[in-house]
């Protein structure tokens, strides 16, 4: 068994040299001594050459030596694995005192903020929100609003036409006609929505937003219209504004007025248009103008937003520049 003693001593010496070699070196050692052609495996195979009466004792000695080396090998493997795990944990250690990643919260677009602010005010006065198609017929966009074909007011709308009868709506007023066709007075509605005109510069875009108001009942008068708009403008801008009503012309209202507010620079600024619903408009939807009257008002949402937040270029609302939009959170 001199060979067993030499192999055991060689194995112990080899393991001592592996104290800092790592798991790969341990695996190579295992294969060399305990693999299919390993030293201890060959010793076990050599038992067939030992006399039968001596074989159990010799086998026991081989197993004892083999197990002693395996115990050292397994202990070193466990120590190496623990050291590797500790090194990995140290490398991946998280400092729980560090601040977490900031969660960026979005905010409403300034145009959406204005629509929300306007509709909230008028909903408290009993107005309900109505909507309608953005692809509109010539009848609802013009004819029913007292703007017949060849009327000069049509030229001011810079219309996007699909064909002679179909267009992208230039105003949300068509929804008023659709509502009056379905309902009888009293009617109290507001119509926020997108409208389209073929114009693009610092104060105009091809698509923008309007909010229209319509109130119809018996004995509705211009004084009520003025009172509602006075209260709205002062609530919207949160200031005790100077407001004036300037005579104007709209085909679908009579009398008509433009509403101005006094700016901080001492100049009047136009903010919306309004008037009493024209009798011809009422007749077109089957409402008797001798029994009912009403007022209508229309405002550009981007215009109101620019004035409220001191924005000078309308196009800023459509460029999706986060540096601009973050100011309105």
Curated annotation (Swiss-Prot):
Its cofactor is Mg(2+). Binds 2 magnesium ions per tetramer. It catalyses: tRNA(Phe) + L-phenylalanine + ATP = L-phenylalanyl-tRNA(Phe) + AMP + diphosphate + H(+). Mg(2+) binds at residue 254. Its EC number is 6.1.1.20. Its main location: cytoplasm. Keywords: Aminoacyl-tRNA synthetase, ATP-binding, Cytoplasm, Ligase, Magnesium, Metal-binding, Nucleotide-binding, Protein biosynthesis. It is found in: Cytoplasm. It comes from the Bacteria. GO terms for biological process: phenylalanyl-tRNA aminoacylation. GO terms for cellular component: cytoplasm. It is an enzyme of class 6 (ligase). Belongs to the class-II aminoacyl-tRNA synthetase family. Phe-tRNA synthetase alpha subunit type 1 subfamily. Tetramer of two alpha and two beta subunits. This is Phenylalanine--tRNA ligase alpha subunit. It comes from Mannheimia succiniciproducens (strain KCTC 0769BP / MBEL55E). The lineage of its organism: Bacteria, Pseudomonadati, Pseudomonadota, Gammaproteobacteria, Pasteurellales.
């Amino acid at each position: 068994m001199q060979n067993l003693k030499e192999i055991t001593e060689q194995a112990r010496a080899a393991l001592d040299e592996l104290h800092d070699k790592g798991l790969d070196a341990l695996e190579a050692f295992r294969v060399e001594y305990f693999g299919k052609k390993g030293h201890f495996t060959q010793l076990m195979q050599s038992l067939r050459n030992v006399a039968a009466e001596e074989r159990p004792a010799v086998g026991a000695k081989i197993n004892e030596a083999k197990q002693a080396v395996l115990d050292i090998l397994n202990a070193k493997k466990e120590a190496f694995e623990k050291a590797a795990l500790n090194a990995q944990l140290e490398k991946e250690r998280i400092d729980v005192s560090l601040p977490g990643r900031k969660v960026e919260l979005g905010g409403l677009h300034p145009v959406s903020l204005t629509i929300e602010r306007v509709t909230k005010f008028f909903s408290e006065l009993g107005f309900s929100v109505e909507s309608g198609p953005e692809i509109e017929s010539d009848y609802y966009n013009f004819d029913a609003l007292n703007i017949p074909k060849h009327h000069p007011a049509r030229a001011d709308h810079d219309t996007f036409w699909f064909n002679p009868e179909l267009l992208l709506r230039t105003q949300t007023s068509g929804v008023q006609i659709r509502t009056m066709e379905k309902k009888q007075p009293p009617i109290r509605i507001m119509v926020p929505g997108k409208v389209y005109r073929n114009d693009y510069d610092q104060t105009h875009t091809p698509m923008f937003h309007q909010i229209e108001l319509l109130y119809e009942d018996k004995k509705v008068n211009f004084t009520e219209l003025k009172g509602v708009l006075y209260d709205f403008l002062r609530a919207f801008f949160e200031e005790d504004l100077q407001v004036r009503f300037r005579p104007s012309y709209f085909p679908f209202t009579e009398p008509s007025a433009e509403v101005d507010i006094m700016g901080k620079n001492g100049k009047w600024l136009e903010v919306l248009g309004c008037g009493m619903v024209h009798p011809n408009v009422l007749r077109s939807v089957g409402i008797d103008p001798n029994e009912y009257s009403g007022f209508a008002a229309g405002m550009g949402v981007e215009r109101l937003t620019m004035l409220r937040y001191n924005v000078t270029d309308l196009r800023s609302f459509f460029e999706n520049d986060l540096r601009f939009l973050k100011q309105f959170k």
